[in-house]
Amino acid sequence: MVDLVKRFLQLEAASGIILFFTAVLALILANSPWSEIYFSFLDIPVQFRVGSLDVHKPLLLWINDGLMAIFFLLVGMEIKREALEGSLSSMRQAGLPVIAAIGGMIVPAAMFSFIINDAPQFMAGWAIPMATDIAFALGVLSLLSGRVPLSLKVFLLALAIIDDLGAIMVIALFYTAELHTIPLLFAVALSAMLLMLNRSRVMLLTPYLIVGALLWLAVLKSGVHATIAGVILGFAIPHIRGATHTPLRQLEHQLHPWSSYFILPFFAFANAGLSFSGLSWTDLGSGLPLAIIVGLFIGKPLGVMLVSWLAVKAKLAALPENVGWQQLFGLSVLCGIGFTMSIFIGGLAFGTASEAFASSRLGILFGSLIAAVFGYILLRNATRTCQRKEQKRVSSQL
C-alpha cells in the first residue's frame, strides 16, 4: 500500500510540473500574435451524431464536459479506494484530513461571499476558492524532494480527495442547469443498472464502461453537469479490500497516466489562456479577482489551520506522524492552489464565454501563484527548522 501511495505521489508531482508549463504556454499564446489561432482552435465545432441523438459543441466544451468526466471517473475510484483501504478507511486516519478539508471549503467560500456581497452578479462564483489542485500542490511539494515526511504528502492527498468530493457535491447541487425529465430518468435507470452490476459481482470492466458511456450522454442531456456521470461510474467499479488485482485497480492504473499527462494538462491549456488585453494591475485589487485571491490565499489556509488546531486541542484528531504545526501551516497555504478545479468551477458558474469567467481566471491564476510561492517558502523554512531541531536532539544524546 505504501508503494502504491509513493507511485501515485510521484505521478501527481510530475503532472503538476507539466500543468505549470501548459498553463504558461496557454497564457503566452493568448497574449501573442498567434492568439487568434489559439482561440479559433478551442472554438472548432465537434459533432457526435447517432440517429436522432445529436451532440454538437465547440472543442472547449468537449474538453470540459467529456475529458473532465474521465478525470472525475478517476476521482470517484480514488475516493472509493481510499475509503475502503487507504487514508480515509478509518476515523483515526481520516479524522484530521476530513475536518481540515471541511474548514478549507467553508472559510474561503464565506470570505468570497463577504467581499463580493455588493456585486450579486458575481455571487455564483462562491465555490471557486474552495478547490485544491492536487497535481499542482504535489508538484510544488516535490521541489522539496525527500525533506518533507511522507505522512505530510499523504495528508495533502487525503485532504484533496475530500476537497474533490465536496466539489462534486457542490457541482451536483448548485451548478445544475434546467433539468430535463426524460434524460434524467434514463440517467437514474442507468445508475441503478451500474449498482446492479456491482451487487451482482460482475468483474468485467466492459459492461460498466458501456453503461457509463450511455450514462454520460443521459446526464449531459438532463441538465446535470456531465462530469457527475464519471463520479457515479467510479463509485460503481468493483473493488475488494486487500486484493491486488481488481477492476478498480486495473482501470485506475490504466487511466492515471492519461489523466496526469494528457487530460489535466490539455484542460489547463484550453482554460488558462487568459488575454490580458484591456486588463490592468488595479483589476486584481477589486471585485471578483480580489475575492478569489483572498479566498484562496487567506481563506483556504485559515480554514484548514483553524479547524485543525481546534480538532487537535479537543483531542478529536492528531497531527500526522513527524509533522509539526509549522509544516502543516505551509501545507495549508499550498492548499490555496486552486488552478484547474477552480477554473472548472468558474466555467460552470459564469459560462466559459463570459467576461466574469475571464475576470475569475485572473484571480485564480494570481491567487494560485501566490499560494504556491508562499507555501513553498513556508514549507522549506519549516523543514529546515525541523532538521536543525533533530540535529540538536541527536547531538545532545551523544
UniProtKB/Swiss-Prot annotation:
Keywords: Antiport, Cell inner membrane, Cell membrane, Ion transport, Membrane, Sodium, Sodium transport, Transmembrane, Transmembrane helix, Transport. The keyword Transport applies. It is a multi-pass membrane protein. GO terms for biological process: regulation of pH. It comes from the Bacteria. The chain crosses the membrane at residues 8-28, 59-79, 96-116, 124-144, 154-174, 177-197, 202-222, 223-243, 261-281, 292-312, 328-348, 362-382. Signal peptide: none annotated. Coiled coil: none annotated. It catalyses: Na(+)(in) + 2 H(+)(out) = Na(+)(out) + 2 H(+)(in). It holds the Pfam family Na_H_antiport_1. It is found in: Cell inner membrane. GO terms for cellular component: plasma membrane. GO terms for molecular function: sodium:proton antiporter activity. Belongs to the NhaA Na(+)/H(+) (TC 2.A.33) antiporter family. Na(+)/H(+) antiporter that extrudes sodium in exchange for external protons. HAMAP family: NhaA. This is Na(+)/H(+) antiporter NhaA. It comes from Tolumonas auensis (strain DSM 9187 / NBRC 110442 / TA 4).
